Amino acid sequence: MKIGLVKTNFPGERRVPLLPKDIKDFKNEILVEEGFGKFLDIDDQEYIDKGCHILSRAEVFSESEAIFSLKLIQPTDYPYLREGQMIIGWTHPFGSGRLFMKEQALPKKLIVVDLDSNSPCIYYENEIFESGIPKGLLYKNSFYAGYAGVLDALLQYGFIPTEETKIAILGSGNVAQGAFSSISKYSSNIRMYYRKTMSIFKENYTKYDIIINGIEIGKEDDPILSFSEQKSLKKGTFIIDVAADAGNTIEGTHFTSMDDPIYENDGKYYYVVPNTPSLIYRNVSQDLSKILSENIFSEDCSRFLSIKS
């Protein structure tokens, strides 16, 4: 299968998901957009030496059966998408990619292979299929999201916590673990809450100075912090949503960006940057490339078409 890799044009994104050193005996033909590896100082010739074809962005879209885009494809690329084309990457169909699914994936009958860190699935014509991709494959990326996101949030906010700072972390998964690993360098006054102890958080949430969210709730679930509950938070409370579950886990929040990462509302501060692993893109690119090479690019991606049979 012809797989096209395009440079992500998602704001602030710098990760390079395929490095030349990891291209070995691929069963797919790889088409790469010119300048693909520029953030890591990788020349196009290094991809050519590994058997890849270097093309313009428009040519990659037009000649590829499948497009790999690390982050959600942006509206400027919508005209390039062809009916029945395969899209591989982090699409977040029920989150930030909801509009993409409605306006592009469904009308154009796109086959969307979503690389969700916990349960990678294939989305096609309002149906969801098992992808065969191992679950939890990209857990390190989620860990880095929590780790780097918390560091960035604190620096952008201009505050390093002390033992007097009361900190709550929602969740116990990879994102929450990364957040804990990061913020515990500065304070041990931390309480982690998960599903069984969330009722205790509800009894104490107004006491915290920093609330870190590492949970992405389901589309039918109630928010963990509603509008009314947020009003009860003390002035200056800092909410760091490293799960980037905008508007869901923390009701009414909206995405922020690396250029403008924090906003204030009613005396509370919110950080909801959706691609925090890119803050440490040099580390993350190494892990991503190895894992994606072994589990996505090396095997013929036409296997994902079996859902249509």
From Swiss-Prot:
Its EC number is 1.5.1.24. It catalyses: N(5)-[1(S)-1-carboxyethyl]-L-ornithine + NADP(+) + H2O = L-ornithine + pyruvate + NADPH + H(+). GO terms for molecular function: alanine dehydrogenase activity; N5-(carboxyethyl)ornithine synthase activity. Pyruvate binds at residues 15, 71, 92. Keywords: NADP, Oxidoreductase. It is an enzyme of class 1 (oxidoreductase). GO terms for biological process: alanine catabolic process. NADP(+) binds at residues 171-176. PANTHER family: ALANINE DEHYDROGENASE (PTHR42795:SF1). Catalyzes the NADPH-dependent reductive condensation between pyruvic acid and the side chain amino group of L-ornithine to form N(5)-(L-1-carboxyethyl)-L-ornithine. To a lesser extent, can also use L-lysine as substrate (yielding N(6)-(L-1-carboxyethyl)-L-lysine). Belongs to the AlaDH/PNT family. CEOS subfamily. This is N(5)-(carboxyethyl)ornithine synthase. It comes from Lactococcus lactis subsp. lactis (strain IL1403). The lineage of its organism: Bacteria, Bacillati, Bacillota, Bacilli, Lactobacillales. The gene is ceo.
